[in-house]
Amino acid sequence: MREHYGVVTPMHNSRPRRVAVLSVHTSPLAQPGTGDAGGMNVYVLQSAIQMARRGVEVEIFTRATSSADAPVQEAAPGVLVRNVVAGPFEGLDKQDLPTQLCAFVAGVLREEARHEPGYYNLVHSHYWLSGQVGWLARDRWGVPLVHTAHTLAAVKNLSLADGDTPEPAARQIGEQQVVAESDRLVANTTEESDQLVRHYGADPNRIDVVAPGADLTRYRPGDRAAARAKLGLDPRETVVTFVGRIQPLKAPDVLLRAAAELIARDPESTLRVLVVGGPSGSGLARPDALIELASSLGIAARVTFLPPQAPDRLVDVYRASDLVAVPSYSESFGLVAIEAQACGTPVIAANVGGLGVAVRNGETGLLVDGHRTEDWATALQSLVSEPGRLAALAAEAPRHAENFSWEHTADGLLESYRMATVNYNYGHGPSEFAPRRAGGLWKLRRAGGVRA
């Protein structure tokens, strides 16, 4: 069918040569586990690296957050990170970022204007803020837009933690626009695909389900005793670990309350809770607040706090743990669960969102319905009190994790890009470019015009 799409040029090949990836609110180079950096950062960087290894150049646009940020950084061969100055470097809350989207758009368009038309063959936006930018870039450049939401306001607002702040209506409106304008939508799971259809009216024929992954060359089973020695953990204790941003959505307090209940039931328990992460979001977001909670629950001596860890150190955290807990109220997938299982560590997780895919219930971990302290304590106790069961889960966990790699993710994304490009070219035909304007900028003329 490709012959029906007109003259084939690099811009109109089904496989892109160069992709503009948009990650407005957080840099792929930021340390996951603090601020707004989390699984999305890992996703953007690792998928870009894998696509570059397949011959697709990737340029990631993100908002500069420090005057020390170089305008361009090479993240890996074939992967550039462009730090766009849009608003103050520090002190700009995530909720205020929409006020700087015009400045960010200008930075992205100016970079493209330095090149010949067709320099970028496709735009892939991550999160709704980036989707707003991608929508305009798509229309200006005459290339397809692929969008990954990562989280959805409508879904988050249905399962808020106590003390958490609802997502504003403006975000849901913005998401609705991006869903309508994207040429392809990438969902982490079939459940997320269903949510896009149910809450945003997305066309299911434009959704591609592509699971995230883990770096399976890094995250793999290792010596638990050696890992505990590196972290200063007692080899005789049973370690249950939380890894992630300290915010109501991630629910580290659920783990602490469950641990306190378990210890109250069994004072001889050797349970140790390890919390690895930094503050983010609203409500119960300060590490100090968790420290105070542990103290009020009478388990302060049983809880160890560590700051966010770099990947080579995070491997030791997973290996040192008997169990990793993911008690989130909402989770589109849950990379921590896959990374932990890849290291041979079972996972106990809330039965929400993509965690039902990331964890194989009863085989590589345990899924808990709801967030009641009693239920979580009982689930924890059922695992830590039965070493044989825990060992069986640990043995199966890496085999399950092998199904999730960034190589598989990149292959899925490239297929989505192919579909987006073929469909876009079929619907729009080749774009026309007017001569350069003064100052070296290109002006795009499209058959259907450019929406205001």
UniProtKB/Swiss-Prot annotation:
Cross-referenced InterPro entries: Glyco_trans_1, Glyco_trans_4-like_N, Mycothiol_biosynthesis_MshA
Protein name: D-inositol 3-phosphate glycosyltransferase
The protein's enzyme class: transferase
GO BP field: mycothiol biosynthetic process
Family annotation (CDD domains): GT4_sucrose_synthase
Record-linked Gene3D superfamilies: Glycogen Phosphorylase B
Positions bound to UDP-N-acetyl-alpha-D-glucosamine: Q31, P32, G39, R245, K250, Q309, E331, E339
UniProt function note: Catalyzes the transfer of a N-acetyl-glucosamine moiety to 1D-myo-inositol 3-phosphate to produce 1D-myo-inositol 2-acetamido-2-deoxy-glucopyranoside 3-phosphate in the mycothiol biosynthesis pathway.
Coiled coil: none
Sample GO molecular function, one term: magnesium ion binding
Binding site for 1D-myo-inositol 3-phosphate: H25, D36, A37, G38, G39, M40, N41, K94, Y127, T151, R171
Enzyme Commission code(s) on record: 2.4.1.250
Family: Belongs to the glycosyltransferase group 1 family. MshA subfamily.
Sequence positions that bind Mg(2+): Y318, R319, S321, T345
Assembly behavior: Homodimer.
Keywords, comma-separated and alphabetical: Glycosyltransferase, Magnesium, Metal-binding, Transferase
Recorded catalytic activity of this chain's protein: 1D-myo-inositol 3-phosphate + UDP-N-acetyl-alpha-D-glucosamine = 1D-myo-inositol 2-acetamido-2-deoxy-alpha-D-glucopyranoside 3-phosphate + UDP + H(+)
